A protein has these predicted regions:
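Short, structured segments at the rim of ligand-binding sites
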Residues: 1-418
């Protein structure tokens, strides 16, 4: 089993290029299966989750090639509607393949999704919405059997919660459904707008993708297209946290400042100076961070749940007491126990975490429970005295491309070991 060893207390400085957004690339790759032609997707990150999506695409009949950060998907010969459990279990968001298969073949048979175990993440919103659009869905033994013998049709759908995954599945299904679909209380994350941009480049008619009320006029067929995935705002915030805990001076290139606006106030309250350029963000951290007021995770444009763990690691060495409230997922404090093994003083009760900043952390052997927990441990390891070994590093590989190489380029002492 591979591990990562970090020797802490090295100040990070310099420039780092941001990868493409995992949370954009995955639904776009899935949507490519509904295109009767070739999709060329640029800035597609090299991640194990992306590899899992490519395996699924190939299994259902797509020809997929990767050259650097560009993935080409030829979905002309898509023919299989059944995705085996072992492929579905490799990524949590694999349920996003449900709507492309229904739209393209009129049927789909998939297992419940895999990936990070960070709570229930129910898919009932996905299923109830697709049923409204004409899908017949049965569940048995963890397998979803879906049919739409009369095709999918437009519908007015109101989500009880602005679920990103449900919004994506509805959006893909609606883009080729008969008639108009309106999604109310839709997710507003930048990744939703990016998926809509890809679908529009394929011929879809979509408006309001960043507004919470999305209108989609279905088209009969998608054509070949080319698209560039947006930068990963979550990894941007992770680099910011890494710079902050080391008193660093880091410029993050190839980013979009408007997408990280929700996290900037937290870093500024902690004493960092943050300057946003046209396509970069510069963070200059103080010698000692300050505690911040209550941080609440919320749907976009609120503070992102995916940034919570790394920022908590940052606040664990801030002067004073900070409070975090996790409003999106239950069971998303699985990194707390491991941070405490490094010397952090964190107490949790339900959704609330109270972080009492300590002078320093001390290196130890810790284990990543999920992707974001792993990034938090990496951030903490950079701040810790001595050596920190992170086990289960394969979970970090699901979302952070070239972590060691990128951090090493900024001055970190970090190595992967077998």
């Amino acid at each position: 089993m591979e591990t990562v060893r970090i020797t802490g207390k090295n100040r990070l400085s310099g420039e780092v290029r941001l990868q493409g957004a995992k949370n954009s690339a995955l639904p776009i790759l899935a949507a490519a299966a509904s295109v009767d032609g070739v999709s060329v997707i640029h800035n597609c990150p090299r991640l194990s989750d992306v590899d899992a999506a490519i395996k699924i695409l190939r299994f259902i009949g797509c020809k997929v090639e990767r050259e650097g950060d560009t993935v080409t998907v030829d979905a002309t010969d898509v023919s299989r509607c059944d995705v085996p459990r072992e492929l579905m279990c490799e990524m949590r968001s694999s349920v996003i393949f449900l709507s492309p298969l229904l739209a393209r073949l009129g049927m789909a048979e998939i297992s419940a999704p895999g990936g990070c175990e960070i709570g229930l993440r129910p898919i009932d919103l996905h299923l109830s919405s697709l049923r409204l659009m004409g899908a017949q869905i049965e569940t048995e033994g963890g397998v979803l059997s879906c049919r739409c013998p009369d095709g999918l049709h437009g519908e007015k759908i109101t989500l009880s919660f602005p679920s990103v995954g449900a919004t994506e599945n509805i959006l893909i299904a609606a883009a080729s459904a008969d008639g108009e679909t309106v999604i109310l209380n839709a997710a507003r994350e930048p990744e939703i707008a990016d998926l809509a941009d890809f679908l529009c480049s394929c011929g879809a008619h979509i408006s309001g993708a960043d507004s919470g009320e999305i209108k989609v006029c279905g088209v009969k067929k998608f054509h070949s297209a080319e698209h560039t995935v947006i930068p990963d705002r979550i990894i941007a915030s992770t680099y910011m946290a890494a710079a902050a805990v080391t008193g660093g001076d880091v410029r993050i290139l190839d980013t979009r400042a408007e997408h990280i606006t929700p996290v900037i106030p937290v870093f500024e309250q902690a004493g960092c100076k943050v300057e946003c350029g046209e396509s970069s963000v510069h963070i200059l951290a103080p010698v000692r961070l300050r505690s911040v007021q209550t941080v609440r995770t919320m749907p976009y444009p609120g503070f992102p749940t995916d940034s919570q763990a790394a920022v908590m690691a940052m606040l664990s060495v801030a002067h004073g007491t900070s409070v975090m409230i996790e409003n999106i997922f239950e069971n998303r404090y699985r990194h707390v126990r491991e941070l405490c093994r490094l010397g952090a003083d964190i107490m949790t009760e339900g959704k609330v975490a109270v972080i009492k900043g300590v002078e320093t952390l001390t290196g130890a052997c810790v284990c990543a429970a999920d992707l974001r927990a792993g990034t938090a441990l990496a951030v903490a390891g950079l701040a810790a005295q001595g050596s920190t070994t992170i086990e289960n590093v394969c979970l970090i590989d699901r979302g952070w491309q070239d972590m060691e190489e990128k951090l090493r380029s900024l001055g970190a002492e970090i190595e992967r070991e077998s």
